[in-house]
Swiss-Prot record:
<dbReference type="InterPro" id="IPR003761">
    <property type="entry name" value="Exonuc_VII_S"/>
</dbReference>
<dbReference type="GO" id="GO:0006308">
    <property type="term" value="P:DNA catabolic process"/>
</dbReference>
<comment type="similarity">
    <text>Belongs to the XseB family.</text>
</comment>
<keyword id="KW-0378">Hydrolase</keyword>
<dbReference type="GO" id="GO:0005829">
    <property type="term" value="C:cytosol"/>
</dbReference>
<dbReference type="GO" id="GO:0008855">
    <property type="term" value="F:exodeoxyribonuclease VII activity"/>
</dbReference>
<comment type="subunit">
    <text>Heterooligomer composed of large and small subunits.</text>
</comment>
<dbReference type="Pfam" id="PF02609">
    <property type="entry name" value="Exonuc_VII_S"/>
</dbReference>
<keyword id="KW-0540">Nuclease</keyword>
<keyword id="KW-0963">Cytoplasm</keyword>
<dbReference type="InterPro" id="IPR037004">
    <property type="entry name" value="Exonuc_VII_ssu_sf"/>
</dbReference>
<dbReference type="GO" id="GO:0009318">
    <property type="term" value="C:exodeoxyribonuclease VII complex"/>
</dbReference>
<keyword id="KW-0269">Exonuclease</keyword>
<comment type="function">
    <text>Bidirectionally degrades single-stranded DNA into large acid-insoluble oligonucleotides, which are then degraded further into small acid-soluble oligonucleotides.</text>
</comment>
<protein>
    <recommendedName>
        <fullName>Exodeoxyribonuclease 7 small subunit</fullName>
        <ecNumber>3.1.11.6</ecNumber>
    </recommendedName>
</protein>
Length: 84
């Protein structure tokens, strides 16, 4: 059975939930009270959540670029952030 695509509301809720979980992980890691193995597991989960969030934000930015484009047929070019 194929997976259904998540609705924009579900994606937003998932993004917010992931961000909240990531903030909690950072707080636990910053406390310095976790045993090493647990801290490594938390760090790994945090990296996963950060990557997912980054991808979600990139997709949202691309959608905004498409919506603001004057030319409907203009190709979407990959986003390249300015690095300073």
């Amino acid at each position: 059975m194929p997976k259904k695509a998540a609705s924009p509301e579900t994606k937003a809720a998932s993004f917010e939930t992931s961000l909240s979980e990531l903030e909690q992980i950072v707080t636990r890691l910053e406390s310095g009270e976790l045993p090493l193995e647990e801290a490594l597991n938390e760090f790994e989960r945090g990296v996963q959540l950060a990557r997912i969030g980054q991808q979600t934000l990139l997709q949202a930015e691309q959608r905004v670029q498409v919506l603001l484009s004057d030319d409907v047929d203009a190709p979407l070019t990959p986003f390249t952030p300015d690095t300073e």
